[in-house]
């Protein structure tokens, strides 16, 4: 049967409602010379079965992680997603990307948001977290805006290597407000402390560091925090939440704001999104936090309940008075993260982080044994590392894809030569050994 949305009777009713007798009457104000004439060059209609076959054939062209061993990173990682997550988020009570507009009617959704906020705050070592942002890059840009507004300064300093895509978002956000973004020099894949000291001043609203950074290297966050504090600038940390299963929580070393990409917490890579941004801060910044906050309260009868609270950040007030104009959140993705953290617990998250770091170092050591290959930097790293190789990274990526291996990210995007390799808890020793053998054959 043809899937036509409107019957002749439906169309007649709609035409009558707008005062037109025919479809030609409806479009009479469109000049004849620009109207399409003749038949559209479309294929014959297909049955449902034929459509599914066609779509499956198109989808099979994708080189997804069900078919290809992935060492891709740079912000999106192939972590394991427990099957229970898909089952729970598919329940009709949860399955929406939006926070309800009559929020207090949906107590279950608000409680899930509240639990998510609580776990993110504990994970980052901060006082308060919001109900999520659009993605990690957006969260970082919003943190920059908060710092500029809070300090009444128009300059931020990037210490070390931050994901170039996130920096591009920050530049877009900062352009209209004339925010000056200054980049420190790099030393061995991380922030050059002398350069940072030279850049940070009493004009600096915030120092921003990614830890682990874009190259996977660990930064000297304690020293960087001191430099920020000496100049009364906010200290903003962009963290991989999985790394916090084993690395010190940013709140413990003086971070004022912690942001991050939450995709690794129970969300699939999904060819780039949707993801969710994490945003946590000290209590002094509570009323300036962007996005939505779920809070716990009691009703007039003394019953515990949940509400959206402190809503002076978005569409509930005049645009020029709002501290942020992001008016929603990634509720469904945040729910995935909430379920993931609940299922894994502290020990589970620590195990995921430990396996990732152990496997990454095993692979790095094996690659260094190959002639012509070496680590690009000697700094400690978490689950990602950069290598130099004897041929252009783009060629290595193309050749290994023929062997069903996603070799990594070409560092050309970061204006560097080399290959960025990420290793998660999913990678087996056999997969890593096959990767090493494939690299060996390139020489």
Swiss-Prot record:
The keyword Oxidoreductase applies. The keyword tRNA processing does not apply. Keywords: Oxidoreductase. InterPro entries: GcvPA, GDC-P_N, GDC_P, PyrdxlP-dep_Trfase, PyrdxlP-dep_Trfase_major, PyrdxlP-dep_Trfase_small. It is an enzyme of class 1 (oxidoreductase). GO terms for molecular function: glycine dehydrogenase (decarboxylating) activity. It comes from the Bacteria. GO terms for biological process: glycine decarboxylation via glycine cleavage system; nucleoside metabolic process. Its EC number is 1.4.4.2. It catalyses: N(6)-[(R)-lipoyl]-L-lysyl-[glycine-cleavage complex H protein] + glycine + H(+) = N(6)-[(R)-S(8)-aminomethyldihydrolipoyl]-L-lysyl-[glycine-cleavage complex H protein] + CO2. Gene3D superfamilies: Aspartate Aminotransferase, domain 1, Type I PLP-dependent aspartate aminotransferase-like (Major domain). SUPFAM superfamilies: PLP-dependent transferases (SSF53383). Pfam families: GDC-P. The glycine cleavage system is composed of four proteins: P, T, L and H. In this organism, the P 'protein' is a heterodimer of two subunits. Belongs to the GcvP family. N-terminal subunit subfamily. The glycine cleavage system catalyzes the degradation of glycine. The P protein binds the alpha-amino group of glycine through its pyridoxal phosphate cofactor; CO(2) is released and the remaining methylamine moiety is then transferred to the lipoamide cofactor of the H protein. NCBIfam families: PRK00451.1 (NF001696). This is Probable glycine dehydrogenase (decarboxylating) subunit 1. It comes from Chloroherpeton thalassium (strain ATCC 35110 / GB-78). The lineage of its organism: Bacteria, Pseudomonadati, Chlorobiota, Chlorobiia, Chlorobiales.
């Amino acid at each position: 049967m043809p899937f036509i949305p409107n019957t002749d009777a439906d169309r007649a009713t709609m035409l009558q409602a707008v005062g037109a007798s025919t479809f030609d009457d409806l479009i009479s104000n469109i000049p004849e010379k620009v109207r399409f004439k003749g038949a559209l060059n479309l294929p014959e209609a297909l049955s449902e079965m034929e459509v599914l076959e066609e779509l499956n054939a198109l989808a099979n062209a994708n080189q997804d992680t069900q078919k290809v061993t992935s060492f891709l990173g740079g912000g999106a990682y192939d972590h394991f997603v427990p099957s229970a997550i898909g089952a729970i988020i598919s329940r009709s009570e949860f399955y929406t990307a939006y926070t309800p507009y009559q929020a207090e009617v949906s107590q279950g959704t608000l409680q899930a948001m509240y639990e998510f906020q609580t776990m993110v705050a504990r994970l980052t070592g901060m006082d308060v977290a919001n109900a999520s942002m659009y993605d990690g890059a957006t969260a970082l840009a919003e943190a920059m805006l908060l710092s500029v507004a809070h300090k009444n300064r128009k300059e931020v300093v990037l210490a070390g290597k931050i994901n170039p895509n996130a920096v591009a978002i920050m530049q877009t956000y900062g352009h209209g407000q004339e925010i000056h973004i200054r980049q420190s020099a790099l030393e061995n894949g991380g922030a050059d402390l002398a350069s940072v000291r030279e850049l940070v001043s009493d004009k600096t609203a915030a120092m921003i560091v990614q830890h682990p950074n874009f190259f996977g290297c660990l930064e000297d966050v304690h020293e960087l925090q001191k430099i920020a504090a000496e100049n009364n600038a906010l200290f903003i940390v962009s963290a991989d939440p999985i790394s916090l299963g084993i690395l010190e929580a940013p709140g413990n070393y003086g971070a004022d704001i912690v942001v991050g990409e939450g995709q690794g917490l129970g969300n699939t890579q999904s060819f780039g999104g949707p993801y969710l941004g994490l945003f946590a801060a000290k209590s002094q910044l509570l009323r300036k936090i962007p996005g939505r906050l779920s809070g716990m309260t009691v009703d007039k009868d003394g019953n515990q309940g949940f509400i959206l609270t402190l809503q002076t950040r978005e569409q509930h007030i005049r645009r020029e008075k709002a501290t942020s104009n992001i008016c929603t959140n990634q509720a469904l993705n945040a729910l995935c993260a909430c379920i993931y953290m609940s299922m894994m617990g502290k020990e589970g998250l620590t195990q995921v982080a430990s396996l990732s770091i152990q496997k990454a170092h095993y692979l790095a050591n094996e690659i260094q044994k190959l002639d012509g290959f070496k680590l690009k930097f000697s700094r400690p790293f978490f689950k990602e590392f950069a290598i130099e190789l004897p041929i252009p990274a783009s060629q290595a990526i193309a050749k290994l894809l023929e062997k069903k291996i996603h070799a990594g990210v070409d560092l050309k995007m970061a204006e560097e030569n080399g290959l960025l390799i990420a290793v998660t808890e999913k990678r087996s020793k056999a997969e890593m050994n096959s990767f090493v053998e494939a690299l060996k054959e390139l020489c």
